[in-house]
């Protein structure tokens, strides 16, 4: 059985995702397409526009994806290298022969060459990194700038190139394949048949219209309003105002210099105002959003994984007939979780936080089972 994995957030699943999956299926000769998907919060530290169960169902109902596996929150709300390492680990546990991903370059050889160049070990890179950090750039920005100094032919400032680079560095036994992104740029809200997830969400929030998505995703938008950070601001604001500084510094991603800034942001009238008040060149919006996730979840540093190349369980969220065959193929060798148990305790806490503004009892974690979507 030829299995190709895609690492995704599907926030929401759109026409570009459909194209990527169908192209990957054709070009890699896959019998089964498997998506490893972020849970209730995204890698950049945002509440997913819809819960993981709805997003997984929409992906499988589209016909492009056969099986959706959860990337646990502790591994998914992380910087790019950790996110990539954990996701690749799951793909390799599932014995996927190929990992396919979208990239701005569309050039797999360039990505592989960049990943294998050991740029980070060169004195020139280290000097450029030191200089960028001294100039006040965040560690991620400084790393990208230093990489560009040493290796100018590969643009490591582009979001999908960054992830592709880290997938290549994390891959052990899996082959890599890339599909060049179509249509709008990641941050481009312009209307096209293929729009970015950011553009789709922004357009929906502006005028209430859903564009550039398959019917399965359009149906999801009719179930309830899209979730975003402002829905969580009353709870988050309360926690920012009341958590002692010493407690806040015990949370993931928060140090002694960031904690006071977060507390001060608690006086702001909205999430966007709070985010703008805290963000600096050193503390990017993404880093602050991840810190806000840690505050909302009360995610302690000692609850963070100690390694990211070994995810302790594999949890299916949705699958069709082909996806079920893929699960049967590995059930004797992989720690599959289909019913609630202690391994999901943290994820249950995540979902309780996620559903606060929704008050949707259907989301309670221990009530959920993997969803079978008939292929007929």
From Swiss-Prot:
Catalytic activity: cytidine(34) in elongator tRNA(Met) + acetate + ATP = N(4)-acetylcytidine(34) in elongator tRNA(Met) + AMP + diphosphate
Domain of life: Bacteria
Family according to the record: Belongs to the TmcAL family.
EC number: 6.3.4.-
Function in brief: Catalyzes the formation of N(4)-acetylcytidine (ac(4)C) at the wobble position of elongator tRNA(Met), using acetate and ATP as substrates. First activates an acetate ion to form acetyladenylate (Ac-AMP) and then transfers the acetyl group to tRNA to form ac(4)C34.
Subcellular location: Cytoplasm
Protein name: tRNA(Met) cytidine acetate ligase
Gene Ontology molecular-function annotations: ATP binding; ligase activity, forming carbon-nitrogen bonds; tRNA binding
Pfam families according to UniProt: HIGH_NTase1
Keyword Protein biosynthesis found: no
InterPro entries with a match to the protein in the record: Rossmann-like_a/b/a_fold, tRNA(Met)_cyd_acetate_ligase
Gene Ontology terms: cellular component: cytoplasm
Residue sites binding ATP per the record: 7-20, 102, 160, 181
Gene3D superfamilies cross-referenced by the UniProt entry: HUPs
Main location: cytoplasm
Record's keyword terms, sorted: ATP-binding, Cytoplasm, Ligase, Nucleotide-binding, RNA-binding, tRNA processing, tRNA-binding
Entry's Gene Ontology BP terms: tRNA modification
Organism: Exiguobacterium sp. (strain ATCC BAA-1283 / AT1b)
Native organism taxonomy: Bacteria, Bacillati, Bacillota, Bacilli, Bacillales
